[in-house]
């Protein structure tokens, strides 16, 4: 994977909005790396309590098997379908961890309690100021998916899904970071599949989106365009 663009897109009135564009380059290697990353459950060992380790192990093993099977099926057929949003989500998560040095928290589906329907945000991290970032990933086969990601993120905020997610993420973040979430000190990352549209045009369209002003009012807003 290669970060091809990293730009600050808005700093008016203290705003902190960023745009990254990631090119997976060799998709075969990228998919193999994603499967390896998902299969690495060493993060479970950080928890002192045996019952927590057992809980996360049980949740993660079945989910990893399911996701990896979807990715492998997509790689074999060239049609990624259900696997595509997992790919966008994991590429974005790894980019924030490796490029920005943000907190390495496993993909949400590996540790969150499974809920019917859409359970909430897809991935989580915190920045160097210990502010929790809630991540949403969207894939569309025919067009850039930033609009769908912004719309869903705005809806999740309105429905207080970020607050609801605190119960699932509390063991990965500090008390002060979680208190900040409740008090409004938090950020959002929107990862989306990108086509051949230039980054300049993507940024212009993102800033014109009806949800942009509200989303940019939070402590940090990050867009991660994934060329897939």
Protein language model regions, located:
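Charged, terminal alpha-helix-loop-beta segments
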Residues: 1, 79, 99, 153-158, ...
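Interdomain/boundary linker segments immediately adjacent to catalytic/signaling cores
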Residues: 1-90
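A short acidic/basic microdomain associated with nuclease active sites
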Residues: 95-116
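Short loop/turn segments at secondary-structure transitions that flank enzyme active sites
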Residues: 98, 129, 140-143
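Active-site beta-strand-loop-beta-strand hairpin of nuclease catalytic cores
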Residues: 125-134
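Catalytic cores of nucleic-acid endonucleases
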Residues: 137-197
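Domain-level recognition of nuclease-like catalytic cores that cleave nucleotide substrates
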Residues: 172-228
């Amino acid at each position: 994977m290669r970060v091809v663009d990293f730009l600050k897109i808005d700093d008016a009135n203290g705003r902190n909005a960023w745009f990254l564009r990631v090119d997976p380059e060799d998709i075969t290697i990228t998919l193999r790396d994603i499967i390896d990353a998902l299969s690495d459950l060493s993060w479970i060992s950080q928890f002192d309590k045996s019952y927590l380790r057992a809980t996360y192990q049980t949740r993660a093993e079945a989910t990893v098997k399911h996701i990896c099977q979807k990715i492998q099926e997509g790689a074999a057929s060239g049609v990624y379908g259900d696997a595509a949003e997992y790919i966008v989500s994991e590429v974005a998560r790894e980019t924030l961890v490796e490029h920005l040095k943000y907190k390495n928290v496993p993909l949400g589906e590996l540790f969150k309690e499974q809920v019917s329907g859409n359970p909430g945000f897809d991935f989580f991290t915190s920045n160097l100021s210990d502010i929790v970032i809630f991540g949403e990933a969207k894939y569309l086969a025919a067009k850039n998916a930033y609009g769908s990601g912004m719309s869903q993120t705005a809806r999740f905020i309105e429905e207080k899904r970020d607050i609801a997610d605190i119960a699932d993420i509390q063991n990965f973040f500090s008390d002060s970071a979680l208190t900040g979430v409740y008090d409004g000190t938090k950020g959002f990352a929107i990862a989306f599949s990108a086509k051949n549209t230039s980054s300049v045009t993507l940024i212009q369209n993102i800033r014109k989106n009806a949800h942009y002003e509200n989303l940019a009012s939070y402590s940090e807003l990050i867009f991660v365009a994934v060329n897939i």
